[in-house]
């Protein structure tokens, strides 16, 4: 929503949330707390926030230039490697600042890189709904992200770190210079399998016109071992980003592949094939915060009283735009789980999307036995209805039928799929690991 400040006429962006449960409110407050630490020219900023019963509003600066990749495919835009360097440098600067605050973004992707205006080359990073504080290095594990850009350690439910964001930067850079995606499959499961294998190359002719420095930059980010990736400071010191661009040859790069990539990504989004793997807060286009205490007392920055009128006046005006309460609906699956075939020792993931209101309770079953969460079985159920069962380190005993059951006061719904586990013979696979890169 576009919001107009009554006193000054200044235009802001409004991000509206419906938060019915304590967990939903806490997730949004966590985003607010994190955004309060992030004040940098390459990060979108927030000026205030309001909370009233089940409604929370964040007031943010407007970033009006559109998504970076949409800008690139515009007929009036000339894409060169020099432009790619400018954008990747800004992304690295923004993420470097985030990491220096002890925070990981965890959802870096093209949609979250916005152009400040429709003519310049300045960008800002947005959407910190999945960001987390990295308080105890090596101990944080997460089960969310966007399949095409998520790092292998997330899929395998292994400890994450600042380098988890660096993998995503590598994927973004690969696509930016070539218009090709290193890991996108025909569906989420195929994409996640591609990421887990961490196999990719520069064999396509698209890379014939890309410099060796650019390829080296990408190669040092798309490393499966989290310890071997460049950090942001090293990225900014890399010969590719540190090179003077004024005298660089402005050779045009083909945008044909990028247009095809964007068209395919839009098509997959329409079919819910490309989506976040369980978002913890439902995010709109922009995020950030630098406001005042909410009505519940969650800590934020002091409010400049001259910027906005009284909380009662402004919040009332903002909250009038919030949608009516949702009608009650019996549970149903808009996306059902599918049969999987995995190799012993790898991870398996069943994904579905559950609709219904009041929000259905969910139980997973292995054959006829209910599943309890453990290190082996992880259940991820998010407020937008996306629900996942992740099975780590799959063994032969996991070969079974799995059922997801959703129940609310109006009824119930189930969907079932089979997991087939391929057991490896002794000695199979030894010495057969593919090299991670050239």
From Swiss-Prot:
Keywords: Actin-binding, ATP-binding, Calcium, Calmodulin-binding, Cell projection, Cytoplasm, Cytoskeleton, Disulfide bond, Immunoglobulin domain, Kinase, Magnesium, Metal-binding, Nucleotide-binding, Phosphoprotein, Serine/threonine-protein kinase, Transferase. Disulfide bonds join 352-404. Its cofactor is Mg(2+); Ca(2+). Its EC number is 2.7.11.18. One of its GO terms (molecular function) is actin binding. The modification Phosphoserine is found at residues 281-282, 294-295, 298, 301. Residues 292-303 have a biased composition (Polar residues). Residues 233-296 are annotated as: Calmodulin-binding. Residues 331-420 form the Ig-like C2-type domain. It is found in: Cytoplasm; Cell projection, Lamellipodium; Cleavage furrow; Cytoplasm, Cytoskeleton, Stress fiber. ATP binds at residue 15. It catalyses: L-seryl-[myosin light chain] + ATP = O-phospho-L-seryl-[myosin light chain] + ADP + H(+); L-threonyl-[myosin light chain] + ATP = O-phospho-L-threonyl-[myosin light chain] + ADP + H(+). The keyword Metal-binding applies. Signal peptide: none annotated. PANTHER family: IMMUNOGLOBULIN, MYOSIN LIGHT CHAIN KINASE, SMOOTH MUSCLE. Belongs to the protein kinase superfamily. CAMK Ser/Thr protein kinase family. This is Myosin light chain kinase, smooth muscle.
């Amino acid at each position: 929503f576009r919001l107009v400040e009554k006193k000054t006429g200044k235009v802001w962006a409004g991000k509206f949330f419906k938060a019915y449960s304590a967990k939903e409110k806490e997730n949004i407050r966590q985003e607010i707390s994190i955004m309060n630490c992030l004040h940098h020219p390459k990060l979108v900023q927030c000026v205030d926030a309001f909370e009233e019963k089940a409604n929370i509003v964040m007031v943010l600066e407007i970033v009006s230039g559109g998504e970076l990749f949409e800008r690139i495919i515009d007929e009036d835009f000339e894409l060169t490697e020099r432009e790619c360097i400018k954008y990747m440098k800004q992304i690295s600067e923004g993420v470097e600042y985030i990491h220096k605050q002890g925070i990981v973004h965890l959802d870096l992707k093209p949609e979250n890189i916005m152009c400040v205006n429709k003519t310049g080359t300045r960008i800002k990073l947005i959407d910190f709904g999945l960001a987390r504080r990295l308080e105890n290095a090596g101990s944080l594990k997460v089960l969310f992200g966007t399949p095409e850009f998520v790092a292998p350690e997330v899929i395998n439910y292994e400890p994450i770190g600042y380098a988890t964001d660096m993998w995503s930067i590598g994927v973004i850079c690969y696509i930016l210079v070539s218009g090709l995606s290193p890991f996108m499959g025909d569906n989420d499961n195929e994409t996640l399998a591609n990421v887990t294998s961490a196999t990719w190359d520069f064999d396509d002719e698209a890379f014939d016109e890309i410099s060796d420095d650019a390829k080296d930059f990408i190669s040092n980010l798309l490393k499966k071992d989290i310890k071997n990736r460049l950090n942001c400071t090293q990225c900014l010191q890399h010969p590719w980003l540190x090179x003077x661009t004024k005298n660089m040859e402005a050779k045009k790069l083909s945008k044909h592949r990028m247009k095809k990539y964007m068209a395919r990504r839009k098509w997959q989004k329409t079919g819910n094939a490309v989506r976040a793997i369980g978002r913890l807060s439902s995010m709109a286009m922009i995020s950030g915060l630098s406001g005042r205490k909410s009505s519940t007392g969650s800590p934020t920055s002091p409010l400049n009283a001259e910027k906005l009128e009284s909380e009662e006046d402004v919040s009332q005006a903002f909250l009038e735009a919030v949608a009516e309460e949702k009608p009650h609906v019996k549970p149903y699956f808009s996306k059902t789980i599918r049969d999987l075939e995995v190799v012993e020792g790898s991870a398996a993931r069943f994904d579905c999307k559950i609709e219904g209101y009041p929000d259905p309770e969910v139980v997973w079953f292995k054959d006829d036995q209910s599943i309890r969460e453990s290190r082996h079985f992880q259940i991820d159920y998010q407020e937008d209805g996306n629900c996942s069962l992740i099975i780590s380190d799959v063994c032969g005993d996991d070969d079974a039928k799995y059922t997801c059951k959703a129940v609310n006061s109006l009824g119930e719904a189930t969907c079932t799929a089979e997991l087939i586990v391929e057991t490896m013979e002794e000695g199979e696979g030894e010495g057969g690991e593919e090299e991670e890169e050239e």
